[in-house]
């Protein structure tokens, strides 16, 4: 009887391990896909930021254009 119980427990553990391996592989694929999507989104955000900066002139004057403070 002890052998049957041990064999049943071993079979259950092997089954759980197999399902865990499948789950880990699926999660790995999901994480990899998300990393690739995030890289694309970062690049897109960088390009949009550059376009926005290029299209809007700055309202802040450069140092050369600034008038000196009144105490000079």
From Swiss-Prot:
Pfam families on file: SlyX (PF04102)
Biased composition (Polar residues): 55-65
InterPro entries, alphabetized: SlyX (IPR007236)
Region described as Disordered: 53-72
UniProt family annotation: Belongs to the SlyX family.
NCBIfam families per the UniProt record, alphabetical: PRK02793.1
Name by which UniProt lists this protein: Protein SlyX
Organism: Salmonella typhi
The encoding gene: slyX
């Amino acid at each position: 009887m002890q052998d049957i119980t041990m064999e049943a427990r071993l079979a259950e553990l092997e089954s759980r391990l197999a399902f865990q391996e499948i789950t880990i592989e699926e999660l790995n694929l999901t994480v990899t896909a998300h990393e690739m999507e995030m890289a694309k989104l970062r690049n897109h955000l960088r390009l949009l930021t550059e376009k926005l900066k290029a299209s809007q002139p700055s309202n802040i004057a450069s140092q050369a254009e600034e008038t000196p403070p009144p105490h000079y």
